[in-house]
Amino acid sequence: MPYDIAIIGAGPAGATLARLLDKRYKVLLLDKRDLMEPEEGERTKCCGGLLAPDAQEVLGRMGLAVPAGVLVDRQLFLVRTIDFDNHLERYYQRFYLNMDRKRFDEWMVSLIPPHVDMGMKCRFTALSERSEGYEIAFIHQNRIYTERVRVMVAADGAWSNVRRQVFPELEGIRRYITIQEWYETQEDIPYYGAIFDSTVTDFYSWIIAKDGRMIIGSALEPDREARSKFEKLKGELRDFGYFFGKRIKREGAYLLRPLSASGIITGNDHMALVGEAAGFISPSSAEGISYAIRSAIALADSLNQGIEGFQYRYRQNLKSLKRNIMLKRIKSTAMYNKTLRGLIMRSGILSTDIME
């Protein structure tokens, strides 16, 4: 018997959708990780692991409270903004939750009801269109399996295999590669760091303290100079007074940045895209969890009214989310223009004075 809905990717978007779909549907959820019985040292998503206020708000609206076991030491409420272009530094108050991203994903998966079939350690490979949906292929323990599905959902992130197989590259979205390194540190870092340097990236870089370690990361153009630019960033931070101990690990991933509404793809009559696979991510901060969850809620609402015509309803449900993305795009114009950013930082507006 074919599945009504197959979801590729069990991150916040896929897990939320699987949890909210009506139990009358036969649902399959696939992920290449094992988020139900994780193994020590298993690869994790390259993510700073900060839960922004927008994501906290949407979790609260769903009646969900983040378990203490998901949070890490320490919880910080200040952002140190370092602008190497303008030789400026300011502090701003922000209320992020500092968390373990892997444990967050595991918690979201644990909320999925038992009627959903979950295939962990399953790597989606291919699809073929049929008159009433798709036939999908995936690999589990070196064996190839196929299933027929009426609706396929791509929730597999920026480097979405589903999106790349079905939809062309669009000019309305820009692709980056994120490099993130974890270091041992003896430093007391009571803030998050946001670093701007246009010689490194036209986006931004970051510093995060997490469980006694220091994370240094950057969103870079995916070219041959990415590694050297990342090393340049680390050199600047050393000169600025940061000390890195032994490197623990290095991570990398792709990141999307929507430049216009045309870069967002919602799918077709037998397919839907959610979260970053669709292009839902903040173009100013790269925050994606709130958009992943909100797009999944919009899709669940449209599918729970029936499969027929779901794509039209999904697009209608997404209008406010698309407007939000475009407002963030306008905000990013000021943030990433070094002249405008310099004027704003020099004015001290919304900044916080640190007590000595």
Where do the PLM segments sit?
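Glycine-rich Rossmann-fold phosphate-binding loop(s) that bind the pyrophosphate
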Residues: 9-11
